[in-house]
Amino acid sequence: MPKIERAIIMAAGLGNRMHPVTLSTPKPMVKVNGVRMIDTVIDGLHENEIYEIYVVVGYLKEQFVTLEKEYSGVRLIENPYYDTCNNISSLYVAREHIENAIILDGDQIIYNPEILAPEFERSGYNSVWTDGETDEWLQTVENGIVTACSRIGGKGGWQLYSISRWTAEDGKKLKRHLEIEFEQKKNQQIYWDDVAMFCYPKEYQLGIRPMNRYDIIEVDNLSELIALDASYKKYVEEK
């Protein structure tokens, strides 16, 4: 059975939907009830004995330097394209580390570290079964294999979350496909997730990792941040 050896944390984005909080603090470093979001991610990885951790940085990158001092094994990778390209650029600059890796966003809160367990059977995303309507990416799964994915959501499917695992074989493949899309095709405004899911779907047999909805919270905007931590209400009241 494959086992995760390293992690890649995406932390280069601008966090525009969380202005004005993110005007001075990169989104993964924003504190929710006193704890930085990225700390819940790194601590969760450590609980699963994953210590080789690459953090891809861009916007306000200097604020992440403290992580290398606070956590042994954390290394920063700079994404010089963060403000001109979509997040395909972040995985592109970290492409040497995808084999046997778990890839996850730094701007989410991990409530259940078990969802980051290192053992896995096939490459794929942590997912939550959704009966009701959602506008998030929704996967169709047959016999444990993802057979389709809708970018516009739907209902009655597996909602994809930004935690994924990649075998050594699929990691090599994904590295090659990233280079083709980013370097040769200049396809630089897509999500990195598009590469396996939509650009080369026939070359991967992705599975899913079922989890519960409240094992993790993705904080997308200021109103969601306020719902979790009332101390941020002041930003709305100041407007």
PLM regions: where:
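Conserved N-terminal catalytic core of the sugar/cofactor nucleotidyltransferase
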Residues: 1-9, 35-100, 184-187
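N-terminal nucleotide-binding beta1-loop-alpha1 segment
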Residues: 1-23
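Conserved alpha/beta core of the MobA/IspD/sugar-nucleotide pyrophosphorylase nucleotidyltransferase superfamily
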Residues: 2-7, 160-239
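Short catalytic helix/loop segments, enriched in acidic residues and glycine
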Residues: 24-38
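Conserved beta-strand segments of alpha/beta enzyme cores
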Residues: 28, 73-75, 205-207
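A structural signal for short hydrophobic beta-strand segments in well-ordered beta-sheet cores
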Residues: 29, 139-141, 208
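Conserved beta-loop-beta/alpha segment of the NTase-like Rossmann-fold superfamily
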Residues: 65, 69-137, 169
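Conserved core of the sugar-phosphate nucleotidyltransferase
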Residues: 112-186
